[in-house]
A protein has these predicted regions:
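Bacterial N-terminal signal peptides
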Residues: 7-16
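Surface-exposed, low-hydrophobicity beta-strand/loop segments enriched in small/polar/acidic residues
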Residues: 155-168, 181
Length: 308
């Protein structure tokens, strides 16, 4: 009898506590992680219908997570249209992970961006089915840019991106957010025969970044984008944390497809496995670094330069 009463009391207590957790997602509760801070972007106004501009709603969810000690920003399956560019924290992007502010301290917060699914095919688009179009990847959680942007010809300028980590106010401009990206696809808008003007993901100022099952691609056919030699503007699929931030980084199952001028841009301390670049002029680019990187399987196809 006592055991039954105690179990019932515990269940009631947990239910009360977790009911008060702001914007708890149903998937989190169903999986047993009922007291984890999970913020569903639909609860902040995102539609995921491919029509509404979801930029403001998703940004609100990201800001809320940072302001409340971190947690998971959850994207249910759908196509999230991004039609507004933002400039803040010395970066330009549709979505910005703002820095954690702790005056006089150097502490960190973890934020996870997690989709429901991310469909990645083993080749460019779906050539094995006789099709060659970006829509074959729509059956997943896709954040797509509806802004063409402007050509960027200055390599020293800050790139315009779909997602970026904003700069912090400490010595190395470190964001102090540990960022995890899982089961998400990011699509940049492009013109036929040209690389996208926007870059994909810019984590140059992230404290640390971890990924699993992430796809970054453009809106046009891959066969029209096999390293166009006269397309001289700069864009990159994935930009890792910069020199002197001394972060620990882990990329797993990240695919840059069809196509950017640079597939991946790395500095030091990068750990990577199952990284794939398609149709980029430079597949894997290593910038200034004082320490080493470690990689397992990396793959490049239809790229002019594999290592730069």
């Amino acid at each position: 009898m006592k055991t039954t009463i105690c179990a019932a009391a515990l269940a009631l207590l947990l239910g009360t506590v977790c009911y008060g957790q702001k914007r708890m997602s149903q998937p989190a509760a169903a999986s047993g992680a009922s007291c984890e801070s999970v913020y569903n972007v639909r609860d902040f106004g995102a539609k995921g219908d491919g029509k509404a501009d979801d930029t403001k709603a998703i940004q609100s969810a990201l800001d809320h997570a940072i302001d409340h000690g971190g947690g998971t920003v959850y994207f249910p399956n759908g196509r999230y249209r991004l039609a507004t560019m933002q400039e803040n924290y010395r970066v330009k992007a549709h979505l910005i992970v703002k820095p954690k502010k702790s005056p006089g301290k150097r502490d960190y917060v973890m934020i996870r961006l997690r989709g429901e699914t991310c469909v990645v095919t083993p080749c460019s688009y779906a050539n094995h089915t006789g099709e060659d179009r970006s829509e074959v990847w729509d059956n997943g959680t896709v954040l797509f840019s509806d802004v063409l942007g402007e050509p960027q010809t200055d390599p020293a300028a800050t790139p315009a991106c779909i997602l970026a980590a904003g700069t912090g106010s400490n010595l190395y401009s470190l964001n102090q957010a540990v960022i995890r990206i899982e089961d998400l696809a990011f699509q940049a808008k492009a013109e036929e025969g040209k690389y996208p003007y926007l870059s994909g993901i810019n984590m140059a100022y992230a404290a640390t970044v971890y990924t699993d099952n992430v796809l970054i691609y453009s809106s046009v056919r891959n066969t029209a984008l096999t390293a166009p030699s006269k397309d001289g503007h700069y864009s990159a699929g994935f930009i890792g944390p910069r020199l002197w931030c001394n972060p620990e980084q882990g990329l797993r199952n990240v695919y840059v497809k069809s196509a950017f001028r640079y597939g991946f841009v790395f500095s030091e301390h990068m750990n990577g496995n199952d990284l794939s670049a398609w149709d980029c002029e430079n597949a894997f680019v290593f910038s200034k670094m004082d320490h080493s990187c470690w990689f397992g399987r990396i793959h490049a196809q239809n790229c002019k330069n594999i290592l730069t």
